[in-house]
């Protein structure tokens, strides 16, 4: 049995020697190294989804097959993980930008995240938290109001601007309108005192 294995190994070595090929494809490995270096530089700038990184590398004129291999390698090494990316993206965008569930879902979809991951990550957001964020944004916007609106058109102008701030962050029109009115009325009460 052992002699059979030795014979098979000798035959394999002779076939390899006869083929005059290298054990490694140096040109391919150099290309992979270039793509890997660029990928790591991009990931060093900020976290990215698999889709984003793949598109950036392909748009940099790298061979799509090599890009695919390098991206798979980064996923195996856990340097690229769509679920971790999504959770961190949602956390940061909610804290720093006050984005709604709807806006975050759209952003993650644009970044090529699978719908199951989006549902899981965005599903953790409670409706009460969403209202609190909208309320905070509305109160921040109306703080710039220095005097009470003198007439209905001026009130509508302030309302429109406040609703616009909330709408751009993806909050529903009904929620934005309700919270904007609440914030404006509270600010008017403060001004009157």
Swiss-Prot record:
Organism superkingdom: Bacteria
Record keywords: Cytoplasm
Record flagged with keyword Cytoplasm: yes
Entries under Pfam families matching the protein: RecX_HTH1, RecX_HTH2, RecX_HTH3
GO terms (BP aspect): regulation of DNA repair
Cellular component GO terms held in the UniProt record: cytoplasm
Main location: cytoplasm
Entry's localization field: Cytoplasm
Listed PANTHER family: REGULATORY PROTEIN RECX FAMILY PROTEIN
Entry's family note: Belongs to the RecX family.
Role summary: Modulates RecA activity.
Protein name: Regulatory protein RecX
């Amino acid at each position: 049995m052992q002699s059979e294995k030795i014979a098979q190994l000798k035959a394999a070595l002779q076939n390899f020697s006869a083929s005059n090929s290298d054990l490694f494809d140096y040109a391919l490995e150099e290309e992979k190294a270039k793509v890997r270096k660029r990928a790591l530089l991009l990931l060093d700038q900020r976290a990215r989804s698999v889709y984003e990184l793949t598109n950036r590398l392909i748009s940099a004129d790298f061979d799509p097959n090599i890009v695919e291999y390098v991206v798979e390698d980064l996923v195996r090494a856990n340097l690229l993980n769509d679920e971790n990316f999504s959770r961190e993206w949602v956390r940061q965008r909610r804290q720093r930008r006050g984005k709604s569930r709807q806006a975050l879902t759209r952003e993650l979809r644009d970044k090529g995240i699978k719908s199951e991951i989006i549902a899981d990550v965005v599903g953790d957001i409670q409706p009460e938290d969403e209202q609190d964020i909208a309320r905070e944004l509305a109160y921040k916007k109306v703080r710039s109001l220095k005097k009470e609106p003198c007439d209905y058109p001026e009130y509508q102008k302030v309302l429109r601007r406040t609703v616009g701030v909330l709408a751009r962050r993806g909050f529903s029109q009904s929620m934005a309108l309700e919270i904007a009115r609440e914030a404006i009325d509270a600010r008017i009460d403060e001004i009157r005192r």
